[in-house]
């Protein structure tokens, strides 16, 4: 299926959401559940059909012999699950009884769960009764017919893309609430591009996993880099406190053939995976600025206190308990402590955390001195449905090269985005690659840079010459030597900046270092600002502004004189 055909299929399927919005007796923020459930049902149906000939052949070849095997056992081996006949999509779609359609869908999902214990409680069985309103009993049948149009020869991996497309559209339609379960795919893809997860016997944690998008994008990265043979050894561990979102995540992993566990729990108070020093990768987009976390329940937890403990705030009233007024640094500490000695992490965090003071500053200072923070990236505003302000990406690496131990790479990406609509932005594929190559160059991987330039040259010949030549120019203007260099307004490697004496006491702080900037991790403090139109230096810009202000004052005085003269002339002309 070509990209154009897939886009058309997604758009056609999205029509099902329009149908539900217009006629279903269901809250606006709930119609995603039945549609995502039908996507899974159609996925299971097509996947089973694609394996059924092999399943039947295996079963019939051994039937009646000493090696005879149960039919369901062969199904699980070849397909991953057994699909009972009542769950066949044709059986549901072809039923003439439109009023009973909801019951058929419910029974199909219940049968799938009964036959496949790992799916127990995952499918949204109970919502379909609301999709057969008395005034339009054929509503659900219309939606089912739309999903029947998915071709049965579709590449099964495309179901994951379809599911992700719907998650993204539902998140956009729900606005702020949508951001609680979905992180925009292009942001996640960039995060994955930086930490470069490797297949094999690796463990991957997301303690605020939402619908599981971090896991899915990591798996797709491995697929793009030809690591499918080892991908099934890669295991994901997610924690999510919202029951409905847990179901979304479990379906997402199944649709994308990702092995993992999703646990319903509150990560502040529960540690279902004993997550201290054991994970190869941690990625997450946790909720920002959470308050009212009970201080006594987290202050002695190793996940949160290795680098210092964020401050508790005493509540008001006789029985009030001490709480953490802002849990951002609980999350940040959690990600750092969950990593093993070679682990890497990427997380989305509120911009304010980069400069937070008090105990949070101490935690940040200790992390910086420990040499585990590799990179900080300021994102553009309007990249998320839940917040309009820019967020920051933190990248940890417990196994940084020795030459990087005393420095951090800062990237200011606030001006790198593609506008979706008035209120939303994203990264294009090329923007993800261009930002990712900065990290590759910082790591000394000049080969990756050359390969990207060559990729763009090939696409300039085959596809859009002007567009891909502009991408080449963007890279070569900033990195003309095909190696990393600081670029004003974009990226800068900054030293931690503490010079110690023989007794490990601080004897000097380097100018413009991180220590000199009060341990701030705000990229804007370091990368500087370039005036693209005139190329002026900061000093030249200040001088230009000074002379412009003097000119402004002169013009203002002239304007006042003219205003007085005009008023006088009008008065003489027309009288009082």
Each PLM stretch: what is its role?
Residues 177-284, 288-301, 349-352, 356-364, ...:
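Conserved S-adenosyl-L-methionine
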Residues 5, 9, 27-30, 139, ...:
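Helical mechanochemical/support elements of P-loop NTPase systems and associated helical scaffolds
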Residues 29-43, 191, 246, 250, ...:
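Conserved Class I SAM-dependent methyltransferase catalytic core
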Residues 1-202, 261-270, 378-381, 405-412, ...:
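Non-catalytic, mostly N-terminal accessory regions of nucleic-acid modification and defense proteins
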